[in-house]
Each structure stands twice: as structure tokens, then as C-alpha cells.
Amino acid sequence: MSKHTVLFELGCEELPPKSLKTLRDALQAETVKGLKDAGLAFASIEAYAAPRRLALKIVDVDGAQADTQKRFDGPAVQAAYDAEGKPTKALEGFMRGQGITADQVSTFQAGKVEKVCYLKDVKGQTLDALLPQILQTALDNLPIAKRMRSAASRTEFVRPVKWVVLLKDDQIIEATIQDHQAGNVTYGHRFHAPEAVTLAHANDYLAALEKAYVVANFEKRQATIQEQVKKLADEVNATAIVPADLLDEVTSLVEWPVALRANFEERFLAVPQEALITTMQDNQKYFCLINSEGKLQPYFITVSNIESKDPTQIIEGNEKVVRPRLSDAEFFFLQDQKQPLASRKEKLANMVFQAQLGTLWDKSTRIAKLAVALSPITGANPADAEKAALLAKCDLTSELVGEFPELQGIAGTYYARIEGENTEVSEALGEQYLPKFAGDVLPKTKTGTTIALADRLDTLVGIFGIGQAPTGSKDPFALRRSAIGILRLIIENELDVTIEELVNLALQGYGDIVKDHDKTLADAVAFLEGRYRAKYEDQGVAVDVLQAVQALAPKSPLDFDKRVNAVNHFRALPEAAALAAANKRVANILAKEAAPEGSVVEANLVEDAEKALFAELQAVTPAVEPLLAAKDYTAALSKLAALRAPIDAFFDGVMVMADDADLKANRLRLLAQLRHLFTVVADVSVLQG
């Protein structure tokens, strides 16, 4: 069968930059699906995307479908022929319906019945016939939220379509896609090479466009931007901040990237750098530069879509554009300083946190009381914790946060520093929202840890207290994410406290607002404990490890974490699988018949294997007990791993359910002692082999 290289390009007006990569990937995925559904094999497929085009190159694709046979079933052979072997009316009707003669009739076995059939040869359709509809269907299935229709077209797309290229090697495939006749003509850069570019072969696409100042390959264009940006940053001994989403967006905005470094006035560096970075990244799509200490430098890098003969004009134009935005940030910052943070509480008293739970000032006072109560646990200074809590939400009323909501907390830190607050208090204002996402950093200060914990606990307990716990996909207060934050704050700061203690402390701040304290306590504790699984699955911990620990229901997150780590370590030991299986066996035996009260009677140990196991238990128990007391669970389980050989020997050579009642009772007690030792850390019988 012949193989071909196919090129498809859809040219249009500038595509939405934030969607370009998604559209490219979806076009490739949908086309692959269409080719597979049609039975057209291919070696590889590459997708391209630039501001004015989406394209595909399909390598070594079949020139046609394989020929097939289609079976049309008729009556049973018994009903198709009479006693003399002549066709019955049933068979004649079948042949007439299929337009065939008797010599074209075949038979096949359908279970226990033999039937007649007609095997019709079906010639496979050509690539030329199939591909246009495959591509049109792929375009129709793209994830486009809002489609538009141009005046001259009956079809809809995310942007008006201008041209279509569809080549099979050096031949145009006759097709109409998106109401445009396919051809072999594409177009280069809108300004550098606006004239038509005729493609002689599908393989010429990338090279022909690069000659016309278009880099169609998204990844190549992106790599070029990264190289240029790094070079410009290196020239001023700085490092560029290159967020992945911003890099994708900038790559989607240009066909021929040319990075240029510009300056802004150094006086703006007095403004919180987070505000400057935010406005330059979000509004201007610039890459900001920082020094080795992470301090913003008075430069930015813009990526132009043209190679100018006078780049100075572009640089000066961007400097002129960014100045008003930086001036706005400076104005907000200076205006905010005219009003001390503490004086903003009156505005907080008019900002609703949640209708039933009061205002943001109500929340602040609850957090302050809770922070003081948490201070002995976190090691924070109670006075610092209380002050930080009362100031924590004040920057929400500031001009700077009003313009840049993502600066909440950060703005407060700057203002607190200016007002002379100590480091614990000022840093806590910015740290209160940490961690913001999975894997994010935690607060560095004890006061920040305290406020972050108090804020989350107050919200969680309050929302549960008014009966608005998360249900299904509804979690308007992001309590699931917040719960994992609480667990991380406790575990990673090694806070020795139970979830129940923390929830109880938070409940005290609500008084009569929460009507059923007992139910709220139980529900909130269960919710937090239920988030262990999400937390540890993110870390790659196996489900059976969690189940082994959860079987003991540890109350302290820190203790829970130590047990998980210990079981994870134990699970990797060569003895683990055999010990888990043995413990399952022990658990099953004791479930059927509980061990009698009392200790093992050494005189009733008659078999060598049971004597050896008892001796090992007597030796290992005093070695393990101090480790358990110190919560060194990893070392404890490692010690217990040495019991594998005597346990295996016991089950190989000893009948637990002996006819002699005393021997049986003694062996059950021995197993109970063993079971107890292995379930102090976790129920290892839950572990899978």
C-alpha cells in the first residue's frame, strides 16, 4: 500500500493566545482519533501552532483503507434448501434482496446453527476521500467556548478563517474545509513577508515559512524566546522570571520572536516588587529581571513580533507604555501609607466574611483569640500572634490590594514593616496564606505558622458549624485544600497536638453562633482525618500503607505521619511481604477464636518452633518498647522484621488448633502477644504483597 506525507494548515486571524497550545493539541488528538477510526495507519504526526495558523504534518499515512469483506446474514441452511438441495423461497428472497445468484451464497456457523450468508467485497476508500471529513470533524470538536462566523462564511470557528492548505506529498487534495477551498498556498509574516508562499511539497512547510519569517513550530519558537531572554538577562547580571504560563502566552503572540531589554525608573523599586512584577507580567506580558538575592532590577524584557531596523523605537515605546502602570502602583502604595493598618479595622467591620459568621473584623478577633490559644503549641509569642491576627486582614481594604488582589498579605507585610512592627508580626501577615497550593512553601516564622493555622481552622469550623460542609464538587471556601494545609502545618512543624484539640479550640471562638458543638466537632474532625488520603496520595504513598495506619486511628497528625513513614520503610524490607501474610493469618485465626485471658505459660510450650518464637518475642519486646515510647516507629518495625524466620517456622511446624485444650489456649495467647506487638505501630496485616 502506498504511503504519503500530508500537510494540513488552517490560516486565520490571530488566535486567542491563551488557547493556542490547547487548540493545537486538541487538533492533533482529534485527527489521530479520526485516522484510527477510519483504519488509516500512519508513522507519526506533528502539530504546529502560531498566532495565525494551526497545522498538522502526518508522515507515512496509508493512501487508502484496506479492502474488507462485509457479511450479510441469511436464513439457516436447513430453511434455505429443500430436501433435493434446491433453494427455498426463503433463500430466493435473501438472494433477491442482496442482488446475488446462488453461486455467491456462502455459509457460516452461528453457534449450533449453520446459516447462509453473502460475503461482499468492500473496496477501501482513498485517503483523498476520507481526510477532508476527518479534518473537518476534528475542527468541529475543538474545545472552543465561543465560535464566530465571518460575513462571507457559513461555518463557525474561533476566529475568521482566511486560507486552507491540504497537500498529499506534492499534490493538492481537493477539499472544502471551513468553507474554504484547499490549496497549496500559505502566507508568511504579516509585515515581513505578507505575500503568498506556494508550497511545492508537504515536507517544505517549516522551511518555507521560516524564509517568510514565521516559526510554525511552537516548541522551537519557545526555545528561541528562552535563549534570547536568558542572553539579555545575563548581559546585566540578572535572572529572568519566566513563569510557564506567561512563556506559553508570549510564544502564542509572536510568529518571529525578537526579545528586547528595556528599562524603568529606579524610583519605582521602592514599590513592593510583587506589585511591579504582577502588572508587568499580567498586563504587559513582560519578563521581569531579578538579581541573585531575588530583588527586582530596573529592567524588563519584551518579545516583539518584528525584527525592527530600529529596535530603540520599540524599546522606548514599551518604556512609555509601562510607566503609567508602574506609576499607578506607586500611587496606591503611597496612598495606603497615609492610613495605619490598625485603623482599617472599621472598614473590615463593614466587609462580610460570611453572612452567618459575621464580618472580616469578627473573623479577625476570633483568629486573634485562637492564635493566642495556639501559641503554646506552635511556640509563638502570644502577644505577637494576637497583634498579627488583628492586622492580618487589614490590607484587604488597601488601594494596592484592591488593584492587585494577589498581593493580599504581602501588602500587609510591607505596611507593617514601614510602621515598625517586628519581623514576627510583619512577616506573619504575608505568611498567613501559606501554603497556597500543593507543594507550596510553609511560613518561616512561628507567628506566621500560628496565624495560618488559626485562619484555616476558624473558616473550616465555622462553615461546618452552619451546616455548609463541602458536598460533591461544591467547595466554595476551598476547605479540602485548606484541610491539607492544616495537616501540613502541623506535621512539617512537628506540632504535637490532636485534630480534636485544635477543632475544640476553634469552636470556642464561635460561642452560640454554632448551635451544635458536638456534631460540628465530630464532623470537622472526620473531615480533616479524611484528607490524609489526598495528602499522602499526592506524595505517592500506597493506599494499603494508609489503611494499615488508619486501622489504629491515631489522633495526632504528627503521630500519623511518623507511622506512615515507618510503614512505608517497613514495606520496602525483604521480610515485609511474608510478615504481612503471617499477620493476616494470625488475625484470621484470632477472629475465629479469641485468645483466652492470661499470659503464655512457658511450661505448655512443647514444640521447638513455638519455644523459639516465644523466646524471640521475649527478647524483642523490651528492645521495641522504648522505641515505641519515643515514637521511633521506623526503628521499631525494623526490629520486628527479625521475627520473620521464627514466625515462618511456627506456622510450618505447629498446629495452633491442637486437640489438647491447654496447648491450644497457650498457642492462641502466643499469637495474641505477637499480634499486639505488630499492631502497635500499624496493622501490617493490611499490607498487600
Swiss-Prot record:
Localization, UniProt: Cytoplasm
Q: Which UniProt keywords apply?
A: Aminoacyl-tRNA synthetase, ATP-binding, Cytoplasm, Ligase, Nucleotide-binding, Protein biosynthesis
Matches recorded under InterPro entries: DALR_anticod-bd, Gly-tRNA-synth_bsu, Gly-tRNA-synth_heterodimer
Read off the SUPFAM superfamilies from this record.
HD-domain/PDEase-like (SSF109604)
Q: Does the keyword Cytoplasm apply?
A: yes
Q: Name one GO biological process term.
A: arginyl-tRNA aminoacylation
Tell me the GO molecular function terms. Answer: arginine-tRNA ligase activity; ATP binding; glycine-tRNA ligase activity
- Pfam families from the UniProt entry: DALR_1, tRNA_synt_2f
**Listed EC numbers:** 6.1.1.14
**What is one GO cellular-component annotation here?**
cytosol
Top-level division of the source organism's lineage: Bacteria
Which reaction is catalysed here? Answer: tRNA(Gly) + glycine + ATP = glycyl-tRNA(Gly) + AMP + diphosphate
How is the subunit organization of this protein annotated in UniProt?
Tetramer of two alpha and two beta subunits.
- What is stated as this protein's family in its record? Belongs to the class-II aminoacyl-tRNA synthetase family.
The name this protein goes by in its record:
Glycine--tRNA ligase beta subunit
**Organism from which the protein derives:** Acinetobacter baylyi (strain ATCC 33305 / BD413 / ADP1)
Gene name linked to the record: glyS
